[in-house]
Amino acid sequence: MNLHQTVEHEAAAAFAAAGIAGSPVVLQPTKNAEHGDFQINGVMGAAKKAKQNPRELAQKVADALAGNAVIESAEVAGPGFINLRLRHEFLAQNIHAALNDARFGVAKTAQPQTVVIDYSSPNLAKEMHVGHLRSSIIGDSISRVLEFTGNTVIRQNHVGDWGTQFGMLVAYLVEQQKDNAAFELADLEQFYRAAKVRFDEDPAFADTAREYVVKLQGGDETVLALWKQFVDISLSHAQAVYDTLGLKLRPEDVAGESKYNDDLQPVADDLVQKGLAVEDDGAKVVFLDEFKNKEGEPAAFIVQKQGGGFLYASTDLACLRYRIGRLKAGRLLYVVDHRQALHFEQLFTTSRKAGYLPEDAKAEFIGFGTMMGKDGKPFKTRSGDTVKLVDLLTEAVERATALVKEKNPELGADEAAKIGKTVGIGAVKYADLSKNRTSDYVFDWDAMLSFEGNTAPYLQYAYTRVQSVFRKAGEWDATAPTVLTEPLEKQLAAELLKFENVLQSVADTAYPHYLAAYLYQAATLFSRFYEACPILKAEGASRNSRLQLAKLTGNTLKQGLDLLGIDVLDVM
């Protein structure tokens, strides 16, 4: 159930009874549980419009809520706030229903969409580095939540598999195989660096590389076969990283830049035909009045270079048109570094004008900040090099495994390694996903691997704590009526019933940290409940009801962490 929506509906009916129908309720959870479960903040705005005394109007609303099946009490506070307490019978009934529902009381959206989400999208011919982490895990989490809430999700890994760098790589590979027929690509990163040195230092080699670019773009079969070697090796490296991270990205989700090659010229010509693109110094350019350059003139969105070459803008236009026209997307999400914001704003504006992005479809730029080191600079190795993502994940598992062994010396090596991988990978992902994606954040091993505070290990341990209760519980009845008598039982119940609203917020806004914050709140509330309300020592209906609350807490933590792409363990 959507608890927020249910309470808001009751409040709206009370507003109507008080003569202010249609005024925004402005419902929020209370910051202090002693004041109740929710607070209505919309009366003062309504009173100003109606030219009434806000406290008197608030009292009318509170009186209209008296005897409500959902609201136990409504008390006016301050200049016109209304604090609401929910009926324990209402909470108990809905906890019982959620516990006995395969989706834990979370309904699917009434308005499902086909959503195309573009994330990860590394440039190929290099190994993935830490700069690819945020897009990969943020996009994965958003796509999971969108699917769980009932949408059709099409994942698109828009890899950079085309461009001038491949001419350089093919030229260097041909050169190496000429000297050594048995030469094979092994270390992709090292090979790329060596090729780049040759390209920068040898003009003749650079000319050869450019010739291979022309052959590649012309469809030369021999050059295409060599190009495919780089693509296949790069994608296998990327898939290994995705598998380690537990992402849902699969090879069939790859839709690289090369996929749209045949559409680039038609798109450029179409923009000219529609009067959007004009010739400017031999290039085809869309001038956008909505954006200004430094001189205050309309910004130039170049769709074809002088000489006929194409750019990212060309590919992105063709790609967007394909996703709307062929994939039938109603919503497009691009999970990309926030520094690309202007490019995507111009892309969406051009696409809207060209008719590629119809009025009933949405395109959203899901920007994110930078992962920083403790020195406040972008995260690097001690030598200043970019950190390979596979190395970062290996270190995470090693650190977590050492920590697990330290806490549980009796664990066998295999069990410690299994727990270490789950904790280590989970810690890296949660440290990112628990932050507002638009912010930069500091990468800190000690903080993310801590079993205290808002971390993955803390939430994973909270889940194992629930499981330990049921290993000792013996018989209990999930179908028996739920009874809530203690304040912390009610608080925990109310929190668990907010799950649907939180997931809908994540689906609507693409901010996974809302879910992380909710799970942390639920886990800390369960910890307080566990200490204050003995579960196994209780008797009768109270014992069974507390077990029901514990079970739904465990279910919610497991499902919620899964939607963040994080695994749980029964024992840690």
Swiss-Prot record:
Complexes and interactors: Monomer.
Domain of life: Bacteria
Motif ('HIGH' region): 122-132
GO molecular function: arginine-tRNA ligase activity; ATP binding
InterPro entries, sorted: aa-tRNA-synth_I_CS, Arg-tRNA-ligase, Arg-tRNA-synth_N, Arg-tRNA-synth_N_sf, ArgRS_core, DALR_anticod-bd, Rossmann-like_a/b/a_fold, tRNAsynth_Ia_anticodon-bd
Protein species of origin: Neisseria gonorrhoeae (strain ATCC 700825 / FA 1090)
Keyword line: Aminoacyl-tRNA synthetase, ATP-binding, Cytoplasm, Ligase, Nucleotide-binding, Protein biosynthesis
Enzyme Commission identifier(s): 6.1.1.19
Subcellular location as annotated: Cytoplasm
EC class (word): ligase
Pfam family, one: tRNA-synt_1d
UniProt-recorded name of the protein: Arginine--tRNA ligase
GO biological process: arginyl-tRNA aminoacylation
Transmembrane segments: none
Lineage start: Bacteria, Pseudomonadati, Pseudomonadota, Betaproteobacteria, Neisseriales
Gene Ontology cellular component annotations, sorted alphabetically: cytoplasm
